[in-house]
Amino acid sequence: MIKPESSPPAEKAAASALKRGRTRAWAWWVAAGLALAVILSGYVRCFTKYGDLTPLIRFGSEFDATVVPSIRAQPHHVQNGDGFDGQFYTQLGTDPLLLKPETPVAMDNTSVRPRRIMLPVLTWLLSAGGQAWLVLWVYPLLNLAAWLALGVVTWRILRPMGNDVAVGAFLAIVLGPGAVESASRAVTDLPAFMLAFLSLGIAGYGGAVVLSLAALGRETTLLAWPGRMGELARWPTSWRRWLLDGAISVAPLAVWMVSLQLRFGSGGAGVDGGNLGLPLSGLFTRLKEIASHLSAQPVASVSDLLLHPAIQCGLLIVSVLTQLIFLLKNPQRNDALWRWGVLAGTLGLCLGWATWEAFYTVTRHLLPLHVAFNLLLVRSENRAVWFWLIIGNLHVLPRVLYWVDFH
């Protein structure tokens, strides 16, 4: 009887590759399950503790007297102080065109808040014409929908790459602090970012229409427009097309802003909403604050260390600078995401103290930089890819812990 020959090297290599492929497939499903569990955890914790999702909206006691009557009549959580921006966008969900006299009175700024009309209009449509009890549920859940969309799109982009770095980048993007910050404060950044992100993959003027909707959610998403301009070498022969594309992207926001200016004036804020300052001024001011925070608030445990404001801010600064340095060090000028990420990172250096004071607000502005860094890192041939991945995402874990422990 002839004994079967052992498998040749090629077959062994194929079997080994198949085994690694199965391992990667399981890793992807585990990563997806982990990401979904983290995303839902904050919402579940909020609901089980308060009975609804209004703590995410962050109504503040300082504005309680001016809340629109339809919202005031509904049970909702009110925190001490001035709350946060989501409270104004939620109220716009009952009257997005500000046709009722009480709506402008409820705004802290009649220029900036109504300018970002996209989510309030969507809330109004999904809440049967602005039914207040539905608005209080629909509005905070729009960030959940955008968050899940980010996960699906990122999964579809990264999974075919089939390597371990891609799994890490997937988790870093989906659980990134910009997404956490947008969801935990029920603001417009993540939904607007997702529309702008999707516009990069839509050819023709349809993509410009989608980008115009994103701009009505957050003006800075217009920084994605250069990413729609194709290869740089073709710009001179396509300038008429790109000008029309840009006009379509900008026109709805421009018309709406002019309308608000004519109706309500400047509202006490400039075009930037008070977010910008001299380059690096906000960053340097925040660096000075880190030392004083460390001395004022002692660290008692590892958890305290990760959640310590000064430590979180320090990790955030290191991560953001690492991401921007990587993109500048590895230029891909014909890549849509690279252009958007670099422009967003440059804008981030010009954010003033009004943004850096609540320092994780910065991560919402820098969502394009964060996503571009992680996606382009996976595609790069850099030998130190794991070093860049870890250092560029040091700020992810502290915000994940904050979200999971939402209170």
Feature map (PLM): residue ranges:
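Membrane-embedded glycan-lipid processing machinery
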Residues: S111, R115, L126, L134-A145, ...
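Transmembrane-helix signature of polytopic, membrane-embedded enzymes
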Residues: W133-W137, T154-L175, F193-M194, D335
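Membrane-interface alpha helices of multi-pass inner-membrane proteins
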Residues: A196-F197, Y205-E231, S249-A251
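Membrane-lumen/periplasm interface segments of specific transmembrane helices
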Residues: I39-P55, P226-L232, S238-G345
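Specific aromatic-rich, kink-prone transmembrane helix
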Residues: V153, L171-I173, P191-G207, A372
